[in-house]
Amino acid sequence: MTARRTRIKFCGLTSAAEVALAVEAGADAIGVIVADSPRRVTLDEAAGIALAVPPFMAKLGVVVDPPADLAVRLRSFGFTLQFSGDEPARVCETLAHGSAYVKAFHVDGAAEDASFERIEAYTHATPMFDTRVDGKAGGTGIPFLWRIVESIAKRRAVIVSGGLTPGNVGACVRALRPYAVDVRSGIETSGRKDIDKMRAFVRAVRDADAET
């Protein structure tokens, strides 16, 4: 019996050198942030990073309520769009231009948020669940209660983000069996990508996969 394989995305990459680290560690996808963030990159930088991503590795452009021209440019570089703001379904569907994309939904309570009921409206999206703390959505470094999205994860492919680290991602994979996991600060030391943490993160996911 073949073990399932959880996809792994390393987010917040800022250079071709960090892409090389992600490849070495065994990530399936990388993300660049073209929105307000300490790890924000310009469009020109995103284009350069895209050229460093090898074939068969996915690349995502993270945006927040983006203008149409930004979405068009990112798609022209080969990025799959990841909408991490309050974008309604019609906007995401229009800007993705019929292509698959990722839509972030933010978790800040002890039960499924009402916004989860609207997931089906995002026809071409894979939903990603991330943490919201004190009004800050994403980039908190704090995990949410995974049981909140357990029922959704049983029904469809989901991506889990928010406070994942080499120390807890295995438990997340065992609990939810998500399609993918997404990590940013959990593979960093002093704000920079750490190859040892990147390898440990991948190893923890693969160990959990093997227990299926």
Which residues fall in each region the model found?
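Conserved N-terminal beta1-alpha1 strand-loop-helix module at the mouth
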Residues: M1-T212
